[in-house]
């Protein structure tokens, strides 16, 4: 399943922002390269009216469960800062300037409503600029102001080697705000090694994209099942597994609709210690299955609960590009886990600016909502 394209920004940026955009998008000294589409599993951009053209799905409501609601911690802001090969340098006027390995990249960011903090010359040092417009059906273009770059380049985060890639949908192969979840998962897996009883802990990664989270889990000793509806994303994830030297780790790469997969796992009686789920607002599976987050999320979480082990270690939901408060996903998770015990913690994932050196804390850029169930 893949996602809807980003919402089109409204309103005009400040004059300085307009000048900066014109300067960055000019053809002078730059080279425009349009690469093959690289889908983001769980979040592929689609045509602007694709969601409207699709028949509205019927909501899949769940029944009230018996038992007490879990305890709760909220709001909890999970902050990702500089991590190995990534940091957010600056943001503002609808853009963000990021460092990915050796490359500086400028991409649109609708949440960056404030003025940029750093001088124009810092922004002009960018190696790659995404210049696509939402009117282009998501098939955006990258401009390389200083030298033509290849489609891929090596990255390392949390000890995992993988490929960054300039995709036609502006994504680059990793969503760094997820680092906060990955660090939590790695620590939980390490702290619970005694639970293995001769077998590795089991992690299910739904809408797994390029597999970085799956490889973090595998490196921490887990047996991982990675599910994504995009063949391209699965292929990219396999490349990353080979590049990271984790080819001997137990990772199952499954190209399938996430809902169909977890329905089958429930029928088979398979269970997991940790489940990560990062669904899109709208998307399609490999066989044309249609996903609408607001209609299908309740049942998806309910199925996830049904395939958690009784002594499970966590269920994580991240939600992007939706018009909702984190309270919406929080209360859904609370009711989903009613009678299961534990604690639900919810809030936002943010990335903190780090300046040019990655060590100078700046503004916090909100990226998504999340709800996470953990045992008490």
What do these predicted ranges mean?
Residues 78-99, 105-176, 183:
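Non-catalytic substrate-recognition/targeting regions of SAM-dependent transferases
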Residues 197-209:
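Conserved class I S-adenosyl-L-methionine
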Residues 210-222:
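Conserved SAM-binding loop of SAM-dependent methyltransferases across substrates and taxa
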Residues 223-228:
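Conserved SAM-binding motif I beta-strand of class I
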Residues 230-276:
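S-adenosyl-L-methionine
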Residues 258-339:
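S-adenosylmethionine
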Residues 312-376:
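C-terminal catalytic and target-recognition region of SAM-dependent MTase-like enzymes
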């Amino acid at each position: 399943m893949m996602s809807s394209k980003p919402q089109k920004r409204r309103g005009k940026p400040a004059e300085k922002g307009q000048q900066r955009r014109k300067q960055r998008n000019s053809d002078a000294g730059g080279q425009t390269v349009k690469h093959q589409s690289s889908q983001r599993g769980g979040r592929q951009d689609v045509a602007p009216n694709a969601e409207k053209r699709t028949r509205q799905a019927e909501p899949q409501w769940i029944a009230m469960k018996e038992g007490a609601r879990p305890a709760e911690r909220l709001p909890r802001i999970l902050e990702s800062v500089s991590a190995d090969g990534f940091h957010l340098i600056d943001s503002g006027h609808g853009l963000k300037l990021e460092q990915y390995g050796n490359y500086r990249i400028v991409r649109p960011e609708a949440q960056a409503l404030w003025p940029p903090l750093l001088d124009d010359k810092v922004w002009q040092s960018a190696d790659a600029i995404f210049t696509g417009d939402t009117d282009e059906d998501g098939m955006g273009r990258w401009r390389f102001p200083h030298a033509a770059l290849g489609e891929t380049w090596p990255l390392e985060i949390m000890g995992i080697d993988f490929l960054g890639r300039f995709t036609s949908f502006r994504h680059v192969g990793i969503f760094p705000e997820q680092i906060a979840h990955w660090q939590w998962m790695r620590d939980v897996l390490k702290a619970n090694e005694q639970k293995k009883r001769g077998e590795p802990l089991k992690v299910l990664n739904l809408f797994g994209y390029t597999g970085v989270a799956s490889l973090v889990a595998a490196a921490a000793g887990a047996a991982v099942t990675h599910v994504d509806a995009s063949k391209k994303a699965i292929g990219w994830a396999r490349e990353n597994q080979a590049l990271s030297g984790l080819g001997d780790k137990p990772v199952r790469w499954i190209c399938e609709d996430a809902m169909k997969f977890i329905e089958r796992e429930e029928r088979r009686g398979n269970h997991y210690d940790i489940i990560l789920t990062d669904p899109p607002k709208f998307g399609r599976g490999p066989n044309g299955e249609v996903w609408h987050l607001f209609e299908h999320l309740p049942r998806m979480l309910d199925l996830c609960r049904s395939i958690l082990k009784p002594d499970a270690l966590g269920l994580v939901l991240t939600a992007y590009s939706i018009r909702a408060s984190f309270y919406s996903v929080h209360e859904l998770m609370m009711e989903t886990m009613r009678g299961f015990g534990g604690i639900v913690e919810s809030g936002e994932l943010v990335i903190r600016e780090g300046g040019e050196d990655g060590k100078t804390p700046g503004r916090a850029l909100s990226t998504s909502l999340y709800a996470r169930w953990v045992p008490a």
